[in-house]
């Protein structure tokens, strides 16, 4: 089906690329795509295009990559050029998903139907940069995707629609991300169909209660504090897959832990002590309970099941992982 509603799209990672693909495949014209500038990535630190740029280029969509959209920011000339491009590109609505740049009021006012954001949480819980990670880390039973009409606040706009998703006990940020991306793509296409048909989308202000913020994930958070309860550490490991991973330091080497589950404590070993190193998993004492680690990665190596890891990098009961710096 071909649609007439013209959609400018702004987004950067895979989560956003799923939405752009759905919009394009549904037949909505996309006269312009905004995405962040290419960034160095990988072992060679070569410049890499974003997932959104790769999709847009592959499908012949015009792409702009301004470093900022704020005239008062660090790149005023580039921002001015980008804003002029938005003004001169005929369109009806802008869809924004994990773009990574702030949109000032001047930009929000350009599209006739405003700017719609796809956010990976059930707002107002987990406003901010890392909603999927923080939902798993906190032990939430469910999360979801919210469509909102954007305003200048941080994820504070009125809500258009939402989809709820249960968080499974073995979900990681990677697995949950993929389900939420698919739901976000479905929601935005449905909303654009309604917008084209009705001319507007009803929206409900966010509740004042239940607001939490999902701070950006920092590498410094990766270090596991073994004094915490085992269930908390297991959630941290799942939340930090694929980035930055849960890090356990042994004799100065940072070992990444990628899969773990809480189990009953064995004895009264100090937190961080390896209680058992078996093919089924490495048991580590925690502040309460113990953690069975079933997937590990040594520096420069690959993720391996415990059995394969131990074959090449033996661990033994009595060894102790260090506590984080300053602990």
UniProtKB/Swiss-Prot annotation:
One CC-aspect GO term: cytosol
Catalytic reactions of this protein: L-methionyl-tRNA(fMet) + (6R)-10-formyltetrahydrofolate = N-formyl-L-methionyl-tRNA(fMet) + (6S)-5,6,7,8-tetrahydrofolate + H(+)
Family annotation (Gene3D superfamilies): Formyl transferase, C-terminal domain, Formyl transferase, N-terminal domain
Keyword Thylakoid: no
Residues bound to (6S)-5,6,7,8-tetrahydrofolate: 121-124
Keyword Protein biosynthesis: yes
Transmembrane segments: none
GO molecular function terms listed in the Swiss-Prot or TrEMBL record: methionyl-tRNA formyltransferase activity
Keywords, alphabetical: Protein biosynthesis, Transferase
Functional description taken from the UniProt entry: Attaches a formyl group to the free amino group of methionyl-tRNA(fMet). The formyl group appears to play a dual role in the initiator identity of N-formylmethionyl-tRNA by promoting its recognition by IF2 and preventing the misappropriation of this tRNA by the elongation apparatus.
Family membership noted in the UniProt record: Belongs to the Fmt family.
Protein name per the record: Methionyl-tRNA formyltransferase
Organism: Burkholderia ambifaria (strain ATCC BAA-244 / DSM 16087 / CCUG 44356 / LMG 19182 / AMMD) (Burkholderia cepacia (strain AMMD))
